[in-house]
UniProtKB/Swiss-Prot annotation:
Binds double-stranded DNA tightly but without sequence specificity. Involved in DNA compaction. This is DNA/RNA-binding protein Alba 2. It comes from Archaeoglobus fulgidus (strain ATCC 49558 / DSM 4304 / JCM 9628 / NBRC 100126 / VC-16). Forms homodimers and homotetramers. Interacts with Alba 1. GO terms for biological process: chromosome condensation. NCBIfam families: DNA-binding protein Alba (TIGR00285), PRK04015.1 (NF003088). The gene is albA2. It is found in: Cytoplasm; Chromosome.
């Protein structure tokens, strides 16, 4: 399952939708959409576009939310929210 992961960043939403659809069409039973920080809303958009517009049979199997603690080069620590959305056929 580790190879069926889409990491969402700052690119346009449709790039990640296409990556997710490609994974599902190549035989993956599940695809994990992962994002951190400000990209979380984009990850939710990706999951909803895949489900509603392209593949209505796909369901949200699981959603995990968490917080990662990052340390900057100056030694300052900051918390960053993360999300994992598991889509399954």
């Amino acid at each position: 399952m580790a190879e069926h992961v889409v990491y969402v960043g700052n690119k346009p939403v449709m790039n990640y939708v296409l990556a997710t659809l490609t994974q599902l069409n190549e035989g993956a039973d599940e695809v994990v959409i992962k994002a951190r920080g400000r990209a979380i809303s984009r990850a939710v958009d990706v999951a909803e576009i895949v489900r509603n517009r392209f593949m209505p049979g796909v369901k949200v199997k699981e959603i995990k939310i968490d917080t990662e603690e990052l340390e900057s080069e100056q030694g300052r620590r900051s918390n960053v929210s993360t999300i994992e959305i598991v889509l399954a056929k």
